A protein has these predicted regions:
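Active-site-proximal specificity loops/subdomain of glycosyltransferases
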Residues: 46-85
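Short, acidic, metal-binding catalytic loop of nucleotide-sugar glycosyltransferases
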Residues: 20-29
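N-proximal low-complexity "stem/linker" segments adjacent to membrane-targeting elements
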Residues: 1-20
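A conserved acidic beta->alpha catalytic loop
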Residues: 34-45, 58-60
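Catalytic-site signature of metal-activated, phosphate-bearing donor transferases
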Residues: 64-69, 94-232
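The conserved acidic donor/metal-binding loop of glycosyltransferases
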Residues: 87-91
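Short beta-strand/loop segment that forms part of the nucleotide-sugar
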Residues: 6, 28-37
């Protein structure tokens, strides 16, 4: 019923959790990993879970313009009508039965974004139950390509201007964003990302927060904890 497309670079920490999340809701879903030349266990984990891995090359750099184009086109040859286009840390809380019900009347699933945060200093992703609403992550990640001819994501895919028969669901489904899973992990991810930013990203300012001082990132993490409420 559904094909899931996700973009990955060195996602060995999140990938198994993401796969388990979607396979528990859509047991027969196909998951396609568009891998940006990962150097960790990302590809190994993907293949061991019967995911298809398709590499894409950006010359060792993060280029949000190329990533936008990939998200706008990677799903068009899918054999299923319903496609889900997301990053590895974006988990949509909808199951097969719910989607079948929505498919009778709607072509895009409406979402409410939540920034999830680990209240403990560990890597136990399954124990992360707290978060806060973030409309920036209320993304249009799940849609029916039989009716949506172009999704037209902007960079980051936070917004889009779809064309075709555009019918958003009345029901709203939570989209959990697992960015704040561990302070040290986040800081190291930011440092790695800052080193890989393309000239196009630097000129546009996209991803500039990855260069923030470590102290600022730790404060943001603690601030998120202070306002988090139980979500799951």
């Amino acid at each position: 019923m559904i094909t899931i497309f996700t973009m990955a670079y060195n996602e060995e920490v999140m990938l198994q959790f993401m796969i388990d999340h979607y396979r528990s809701r859509f047991p027969n879903c196909q998951i396609i990993i568009r891998d940006n030349q990962s150097t960790d266990r990302t590809v190994e984990i993907a293949l061991s879970n019967n995911c298809e891995v398709l590499p894409y090359d950006t010359g060792g750099q993060i280029d949000d313009f190329k990533l936008r184009d990939l998200k706008n086109n990677c799903w068009k040859e899918s054999k299923t009508d319903w496609v889900l286009v997301c990053d590895v840390d974006e988990l949509l809380d909808i199951n097969e039965e719910q989607l079948k019900n929505e498919a009778a009347n709607f072509t895009i699933i409406k979402t409410q974004g939540y920034d999830m945060i680990n209240m403990e200093d560990n890597f136990d992703l399954s124990s992360i139950k707290y978060g806060s609403k973030d409309n920036n992550y209320s993304k249009s990640v799940l849609f029916n390509k039989q009716y949506i001819k172009e999704i037209n994501y902007y960079c980051g895919a936070h917004n889009c201007t779809p064309s075709g028969t555009v019918l958003y669901s009345d029901n709203i489904y939570n989209l959990y964003h697992y960015k704040f899973i561990n302070q040290d992990y986040l800081i190291n991810r930011f440092k790695l990302t800052a080193q890989r930013l393309s000239e196009a990203n630097k000129k546009s300012g996209m991803g500039a927060y990855n260069s923030d001082p470590e102290e600022k990132t730790r404060k943001v993490f603690q601030d998120r904890r202070s306002v988090a409420t139980k979500v799951l």
